[in-house]
Design a protein with these regions (language model features):
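Bacterial N-terminal signal peptides that target proteins for export
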Residues: 1-11
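Sequence context surrounding c-type heme c attachment/ligation sites in exported
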Residues: 24-57, 74, 78-179
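Short, structured beta-strand/loop micro-motifs enriched in basic residues and often containing a Trp
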Residues: 57-68
Length: 179
C-alpha cells in the first residue's frame, strides 16, 4: 500500500481557486430559452405555494433554489438565483365554474407548463433594453419535458414593471412570510 502525503491547506486553496476560474470564466452567459428545468427543483424550498390565479384559471407552485432562498428584501436575489414555477390548470366543473376544495382554494388539475427564471452576471444582455429584466433569463417547458413554444418576451413584459422588486412577482409577500 502506498500512502500519498495529505494535501496542504495552501495546495487545497490553490486547487479551489483554479477550479473556480475554470468553471466560471469559460461559461458563456445564458440566453432566454436556454435554462433547463433543474432535476431536483421539487426538493427546493417553496417561494410560494398554491398561488391562486382564478383570472387565468390556474394554480401555481413556485420553488426557489437555496441561493435564491438566501436573499434579503433589501438586497434582492443574488447571482445564481433560480425560480421554477409550475402552472396547473384549475379544475372546472361541467358548468365551467372552477372547483374549490374544503379550504376554499382552487383545485389543481393538469400541469400546463414549467417556467424557469434564473439570474447571473451578464445573463439576458442580448435582450433589447426596453424588455431587459436585469440579469434574469427565462425558459418555458411542456409537461413532457419538451421546450414550450412560449415567447419569453411575454415573461419579460410581465416582470418588467417589477424593477424595484428585482423583477420578481410577490416579492413583498415572500419576504413578509419569512419574518
Amino acid at each position: 500500500m502506498t500512502l500519498r502525503p495529505a494535501a496542504t491547506p495552501l495546495a487545497m486553496l490553490a486547487a479551489a481557486a483554479l477550479w473556480g476560474c475554470a468553471t466560471t470564466a469559460t461559461a458563456p452567459p445564458m440566453k432566454d430559452g436556454e435554462l433547463q428545468v433543474p432535476a431536483d427543483y421539487k426538493s427546493w424550498p417553496k417561494f410560494l405555494s398554491a398561488v391562486q390565479r382564478p383570472d387565468a384559471k390556474q394554480v401555481r407552485e413556485i420553488y426557489m433554489n437555496p441561493m435564491a432562498r438566501n436573499a434579503s428584501a433589501s438586497g434582492g436575489f443574488g447571482n445564481g438565483g433560480v425560480f421554477v414555477m409550475e402552472n396547473f390548470a384549475a379544475k372546472a366543473r361541467a358548468d365551467g365554474t372552477l372547483e374549490t376544495g374544503a379550504d376554499g382554494k382552487l383545485v389543481k388539475g393538469d400541469l400546463l407548463r414549467v417556467f424557469v427564471m434564473g439570474k447571473n452576471a451578464g445573463w439576458g444582455q442580448d435582450v433589447a433594453e426596453p424588455l431587459r429584466n436585469g440579469n434574469w433569463v427565462y425558459a418555458a417547458w411542456l409537461p413532457s419535458g419538451q421546450k414550450a413554444p412560449d415567447d419569453t418576451n411575454t415573461c419579460r413584459a410581465c416582470h418588467l414593471p417589477l424593477s424595484g422588486k428585482d423583477f420578481v412577482h410577490r416579492y413583498d409577500e415572500h419576504f413578509a412570510s419569512r419574518q
